[in-house]
Regions:
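Secreted/extracellular ectodomain signature
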Residues: 16-184
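C-terminal motif of bacterial Sec signal peptides marking the signal peptidase cleavage site
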Residues: 11-14
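Sec-dependent signal peptide recognition
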Residues: 1-8
Length: 184
């Protein structure tokens, strides 16, 4: 078990926020993660369309807050699009996924990300375009996730707790997969 997890579980971990996102976690004790309940091919209007899908599903489930997709394009890495939080990332039921951003991008997570915004179990692959360290997969990205016919893109899997959660395979852009959504 990771040392920070033990401290957090014992209620002994104080949250100091002096990193690059200083102030962004003020008043926030955790950031929620879910997987979409719908599947779509690689053409969902780039990162903006993916973010809109996450926001829509969060709103439909009455989740407060801003949600964005865990999705990188070659020109827009997730590490530059999402809040790099110093608080834990959890599923919508409270299950711990990672202690903080650095833990999220260290190659393993504590539990599979397999619950949708309504806490229903969902399985399968997930469009990510993102390597385990939060940087983009540089070989192809379905033309910035705006094409369902050209190329391939990186996907993860909801069944994994190792690096495969975000970097598992490179299916054709016509494949219908889910997205991960993370509270900002």
């Amino acid at each position: 078990m990771k040392p920070l997890l033990l401290l957090a579980m014992a209620g002994l971990l104080a949250c100091n926020d002096s990193g690059t996102d200083s102030g962004m976690d003020s008043g926030i004790s955790q950031r929620r993660i879910f997987v979409t309940d719908t599947i779509q091919n690689g053409n969902f209007g780039g990162t903006a369309g993916a973010d809109e899908l996450c926001a829509s599903q969060a709103a439909a489930a009455r989740l407060q807050g801003e949600f964005k997709a865990w999705l990188s394009t070659i020109s827009s890495p997730v590490s530059g699009r999402l809040t790099q939080s110093s608080v834990p990332y959890v599923l919508v039921d409270g299950t711990l996924i990672a202690n903080d951003w650095n833990d999220l991008v260290d190659g393993s997570i504590f539990a599979p990300i397999n619950l949708d915004a309504n806490q229903q179990v969902r399985s399968g692959d997930v469009w990510t375009g993102t390597l385990p360290d939060g940087l983009p997969y540089m070989n192809d990205d379905c033309e910035g996730f705006t094409s369902d016919s050209a190329g391939i893109a990186l996907c993860g899997t909801t069944a994994s707790m190792n690096a495969n959660w975000t970097a598992n395979a490179t299916p054709p852009c016509s494949t219908e997969l889910r997205l991960y959504c993370i509270e900002q």
